Amino acid sequence: MVSKQQTMGFQTEVKQMLHLVVHSLYSNKEIFLRELISNASDALDKLRFLALSNGSLFENDSDLKISIQINEKLQTITISDNGIGLSWEEAVENLGTIAKSGTKEFISQLTGEQAKDSQLIGQFGVGFYSAFIVADKVTVKSRRAGLQPEDGIVWESKGDGEFTIGYEKKSTRGTEITLHLKPENDEFLSDWRIRGIISKYSDHICWPIVMKKLSEEGKESKEFETVNKATALWTLQKSEISEEDYKQLYKHISHDYMDPLTWSHNHVEGKHEYITLLYIPAHAPFDLWQHEAKHGLKLYVKRVFIMDEATQFLPRYLRFVKGIVDASDLPLNISREILQDNKQVESIRAACTKRVLSMLEKMATNDKETYQKFWNEFGLVLKEGPIEDFANKEAIAKLLRFSTTASGSEKQEVSLEEYISRMKEGQDKIYYITASSYNAAKNSPHLEIFRKKGIEVLLLSDKVDEWLVGYMNEFAGKKLQSISKGKIELGDDETSEQIKEQEKTLEPLIKHIKSVLNERVKDVLLTNRLTDSPACVVADEQDMGLEMQRILQAAGQQVPVSKPIFEINPDHALIKRLHDIQDDNQFELWVTMLFEQAVLAEGGQLDNPADFVNRVNRLLVSS
């Protein structure tokens, strides 16, 4: 008997989601069962975890399982579990609302490919709504463990924008979901069809999934049998697990639609005993760059599920890794707070980090094509590594990939080891330039002398690159040097002597330029970097790089005041022309224009662009 029944409207986002799920996945209907079994498995995990500290939640029934029953006469499928269950408030919250951001992201991720889109619903935590792909009505009966039988609830909806919810006595805890199938979906009333779907998607679920036994004639009996392997797959030896099993387990724990690129499965014995199963995904999740996004590994203690998103077992720059840690020696009642200061956790973290880096190094060495796919998805995150993880800095540096002047492409595919193997005789530094974009880096005037001498330069245009080179100042004994900071020594004694001579000759001109630019520059020098451009701006050796200054300013942060050095090319026609200008106003116009032109060439911004345009126009008219 249902009491206190209410009719409520779905949140707007749920209506959108229902429409999207039903209409975008209609040709891959069978995934509804995978999603509902996955939810039931989570409910059993939660109950077992909470019962560690409150055994009464078992209510004298610790035989945890998922049950599936078919009723051909009523045209229904019922998926039930004796897990944690739902209270009234939880049913309204979990079945009637979703995060607004989730809907937006879901829509943006839809590809039109049924196989991919079918996996997205699990990734976005809306798997329950897949029930409406096959059902025209869904009934949920549930009671949260620990509540009274009278607190049982019944929730029902036709997926048409509203649902009803009321109280109904339920003697057992857990959740029972009944799907009233649409006439065209009667294929799912076949026992063998359902068993086939379970075998395909849910064989690896570690809880028993039970169905009624079939006689030799194909008739149901009253007895139940387990229809999945119901094994904690990761506890088996590698030789006992097929490649397909590994892939299916990955898809279950990650809600990903693609196979992983690779994985590492290890049983560790000794002072600490634990199992790790770590996966490298094939593509980046939608929330990789959201600071509050959940990440981390699933933690089990002696096969008992403890928590999702245990972030303590991997550093943040490896947040894309999915997997499981099953520790034998951690206390069952461990909390996130205790994990922070636990010596064994630190040991497992160090081992997991080295294992992931080793996996990636192996991939980079043996399968360059697959590693390039990985880099295209996760390279930007891996660049955070040397900043966060000093102990593994060298190992991470080997995995980094860059665009260079030799590669001739924006694609980041050159390793530091490759760069060193191509260094010119006598070259003892790894040269790089940072800029706001690949094109800005590729076309920087600072590259002119390096192109002339055939010296390769790393082109760094990701925002993280400025921090990266700040923490990684050398590799394999070779210092990394910015070509837009300080002096550049290319071992050309003849050029150095020539510049010294020119400095003496052009001293009056240099002083005159300094007096014009005054407080806008730290110094004016002759350059050895330019061959085609008249001038450039560089940062002093000890100052913050110009690109880093721009990044911090754009982020609204205080930036130490540092002025650029203005370097002029004495062999350029425009600089030679300055010699002949007698009129001070005209000289000032030319110098200011050349300086501002150099700032723009470096990707900088002018305080007053209109003044610059006006100056250029005046010079064009007078020339």
From Swiss-Prot:
Signal peptide: none annotated. Keywords: ATP-binding, Chaperone, Cytoplasm, Nucleotide-binding, Stress response. Residues 1-336 are annotated as: A. Residues 551-623 are annotated as: C. Belongs to the heat shock protein 90 family. Molecular chaperone. Has ATPase activity. GO terms for cellular component: cytoplasm. Residues 337-550 are annotated as: B. Homodimer. Gene3D superfamilies: 3.30.230.80, 3.40.50.11260, Heat shock protein 90, C-terminal domain, Histidine kinase-like ATPase, C-terminal domain. It comes from the Bacteria. It is found in: Cytoplasm. The lineage of its organism: Bacteria, Pseudomonadati, Pseudomonadota, Gammaproteobacteria, Legionellales. Its main location: cytoplasm. NCBIfam families: PRK05218.1. This is Chaperone protein HtpG. GO terms for molecular function: ATP binding; ATP hydrolysis activity; ATP-dependent protein folding chaperone; unfolded protein binding.
